[in-house]
């Protein structure tokens, strides 16, 4: 499939105004300069494929050919829809420039023929590319290439979401452990139960803050009795009290 090289070859109708954001996988931004060099049939395929996979398509003036945003993660792509050995220098120069600017960059190259594939492989080594910096994805046709792009963007988005979920889970577990430790410290004070400990936590906060609180402050901000407030103050401030053996 040959690419149209002039913007005058662009015959598709302009995209409709964007609809209100709906639940989906994310947003795909397509470079307007890249779009204007492609066959309209490929652009129509891309638009339909994105819609079928719950991505919203925007046309923007951006440096890479595509940027996918999946919530917390942005992934950029260079998409060469028909490898041209006469243009290899410009392609790899652009790759080197963008890989310094973008954290997540992939290069998808359509090499429909054996000769194009061999030419691409020679160029890859000629320009000193390192495996995975960035990752190159050779494909046999543009449609397959774009399907690969969407799969990569989606997979990375899922991994990022799972990482966030895992981190939140760990934070919740740590919070529960801290709460348990907090309650154990306070309920080790003679006469203080879980209700009292929770009341102190909500009204005053940390162990350090409770240790510094006065009897008056505890009585004004919790439902603890005078005896319990006195016990707490003595526990944290009277060495003869907190160093002596206690029998519950």
Curated annotation (Swiss-Prot):
Which InterPro entries is this protein grouped with?
A: PTD (IPR039172), RuvA_2-like (IPR010994)
Key words, A-Z: Cell membrane, Chromosome, Cytoplasm, DNA recombination, Endonuclease, Hydrolase, Meiosis, Membrane, Nuclease, Nucleus
Q: Principal localization? A: nucleus
Kindly state the tissue distribution recorded for this protein: Highly expressed in anthers and pistil during meiosis. Expressed in pollen mother cells (PMCs) during meiosis. Expressed at low levels in roots, shoots, leaves, flowers, and glumes.
- A single Pfam family it belongs to is HHH_5
Gene Ontology MF: a single term: endonuclease activity
Deletion consequences = Complete sterility of male and female gametophytes due to altered meiosis. Striking reduction in the number of meiotic crossovers.
Region (Disordered), start-end ranges: 1-25
Q: What are the subcellular locations of this protein?
A: Chromosome; Nucleus; Cytoplasm; Cell membrane
Q: Name one GO cellular component term.
A: nucleus
- Does Oxidoreductase appear among the keywords? no
- UniProt entry tagged with the keyword Cell division: no
Q: Where is the composition biased (Polar residues)?
A: 1-10
Enzyme Commission numbers on file: 3.1.-.-
Q: Which GO terms describe its biological process?
A: chromosome segregation; male meiotic nuclear division; plant-type sporogenesis; pollen development; positive regulation of reciprocal meiotic recombination; reciprocal meiotic recombination; resolution of meiotic recombination intermediates
Q: What does this protein do?
A: Essential for normal crossover (CO) formation during meiosis. Essential component for the formation of class I meiotic COs. Interacts with SHOC1, another meiotic component, to regulate CO formation, possibly by stabilizing the recombination intermediates during meiosis. PTD and SHOC1 may form transient heterotrimeric or heterotetrameric complexes with HEI10 and/or ZIP4 to promote class I COs formation. Does not seem to be involved in early meiotic recombination steps involving double-strand break (DSB) formation, processing, and single-strand invasion.
Tell me the subunit arrangement: Interacts with SHOC1 (via C-terminus). Interacts with HEI10.
> What does the similarity note say?
Belongs to the ERCC1/RAD10/SWI10 family.
Q: What is this protein called?
A: Protein PARTING DANCERS homolog
What is the originating organism of this protein? Oryza sativa subsp. japonica
